[in-house]
Regions:
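Aromatic-rich peripheral "rim/lid" segments of glycoside hydrolase catalytic domains that contact
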Residues: 314-328
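Extended ligand-binding clefts on enzyme/binding-domain cores
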Residues: 36-37, 51-57, 79-267, 274-282, ...
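N-terminal carbohydrate-binding/catalytic regions of secreted carbohydrate-active enzymes
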Residues: 1-59, 65, 72-75, 195-196, ...
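Alpha-helical scaffold elements that line and support the substrate/ligand-binding pocket
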Residues: 5, 63-71, 130-138
């Protein structure tokens, strides 16, 4: 839902944005109780919640999309977008662990949590880190926390440095706030899997919006493309250990456990070309351009994740994923 809001505001589709927002507040957002202000992370199309709990990256995108909506359309057309963004931030930052619910930004580490509760608040997810979003909040959220959000942006960039393997450019799905592996011996956690695909695209976004960490980001972009290229630009798979070795266990997507040359990773590795300085970056863009969004050989089709990452990558590479400044 929060991805849909971001896409709608980027394409100046207020009609779609408002319909999505109203549906989300009706069926997904908690209006009272310990989770007030947060959104259930998954719902059926009839509004039934698959889970009550939030996923912190959802709130990250909700807030940023609402601020952009405020900048683009103002706040007097039926929805006060800025007030809604501030409400999410205020509701979150007022939480203190009561009923096991926490802010979605860990206030000690100034880093986003995996889930804003007592368990999920102990660690983070590299793919949730979009430092440029905090810069947007610092500039336009008007919630009295501008300095805090700027520090969150800096901490997030520092954290990413620690989370990326120095040779392969790969990162784990989840890790500790200091960038170290969880070491939990579970299939999801220490390896580069589905969540991790988003990291190249997110770092490219920070590069293109802020240029606050330019040299490291260029090195990172070259590094991860070099690794994937070494695996075969048409054959690299979607799950690796962070050192580039083959995973012992394959995470299931669809009915079959299979390593695939997934469109989602084809897309985000192409988006990384925004910050790359080597010639092979053009090949990654060409591969995305010519890739088809269709079922894999085993019949699995991912409309949601592959589809949205493909769209976001095209938005990045075409110059249509931008900071939206206030209308004058």
């Amino acid at each position: 839902m929060s991805y849909g809001l971001m896409i709608a505001v980027q394409f100046d589709r207020q009609d779609i944005f408002d319909r999505l927002w109203r549906w989300g507040t009706k069926y997904m957002q908690h209006q009272e109780g310990p989770l007030k202000g947060y959104f259930a992370w998954s719902c059926k199309t009839d509004g039934t919640r698959n889970s009550q709990g939030p996923a912190s990256d959802g709130e990250l995108y909700y807030v940023t999309a609402l601020i952009f909506a405020s900048n683009r359309w103002g706040n007097d057309t039926g929805i006060n977008y800025l007030a809604e963004a501030q409400n999410i931030l205020n509701c979150s930052m007022e939480k203190d662990g009561t009923n096991r619910v926490m802010p979605f930004i860990n206030v000690e580490h100034k880093l986003i949590t995996f889930v804003p509760d007592i368990h999920g608040g102990r660690f983070t997810d590299p793919s949730y880190h979009v430092p440029a979003f905090y810069e947007v909040w610092a500039r336009w959220a008007n919630d009295g926390r501008a300095d805090f959000w700027r520090e969150c942006a800096e901490r997030s960039r520092e954290y990413l440095h620690k989370s990326i393997h120095p040779v392969t450019g790969l990162n784990p799905d989840y890790n500790n706030y200091d960038g170290s592996l969880l070491g939990n011996n579970r299939i999801i956690g220490d390896a580069f899997r589905f969540d991790s695909w988003r990291v190249p695209m997110n770092i490219a976004l920070d590069y293109s919006w802020t240029c606050a960490d330019k040299e490291w980001q260029q090195e990172y972009g070259n590094k991860i493309q070099d690794f994937l290229y070494s695996q075969g630009i048409d054959t690299f798979v979607d799950q690796y250990n962070v050192d580039g070795t083959q995973v012992k266990d394959t995470l299931r997507a669809g009915e079959h456990k299979a390593l695939r040359h997934s469109l989602g990773l084809v897309a985000t590795s192409a988006a990384a070309s925004l910050m790359c300085t080597h010639e092979k970056s053009r090949e990654f863009v060409d591969k995305l351009w010519n890739a088809k969004h269709e079922p894999y050989e085993d019949g699995y089709f991912d409309a949601y994740y592959d589809g949205l990452l493909r769209l976001f990558a095209f938005m990045h590479l075409s110059g249509n994923y931008r900071i939206i400044f206030p209308e004058k």
